[in-house]
């Protein structure tokens, strides 16, 4: 009598395991990049919340606010998120500082700044690595 065997051979199982390993190796870096972007977007969102107050202060006073209090926003330690330690306003530059733990290792403790320049009668905002303005009265 001939018996019919059902199931996978060892070779077939090894091939499936190899394919799953390759897919995981490709997906993991993409996932880590995605989580870092999501964490940085929180920093941008919290920093952007201060732009209108900084702009209004500049337009009313002709100089950039020296700190959070002058800008009329909450203190730096009160503006925080799940991944953001604090958001400071210093001479009109809004800087978000990432936490040193619990975030993607590439952005731990890093800072992101938003700063404005007066151009043709309007205020134009920029985003990038931390900057410092030498004088609060400077137009740029």
Predicted regions and their residues:
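Residue-identity detector for threonine
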Residues: 3, 9, 35, 55, ...
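Conserved hydrophobic/amphipathic alpha-helical signal-anchor segments
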Residues: 33-75
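Generic intrinsically disordered, low-complexity segments enriched for polar/acidic and small residues
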Residues: 5, 28-31, 54-55, 80, ...
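N-terminal single-pass transmembrane signal-anchor helix
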Residues: 2-42, 46, 50
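Periplasmic/extracellular, small/polar-rich flexible segments of pilin-like filament-forming proteins
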Residues: 59-140
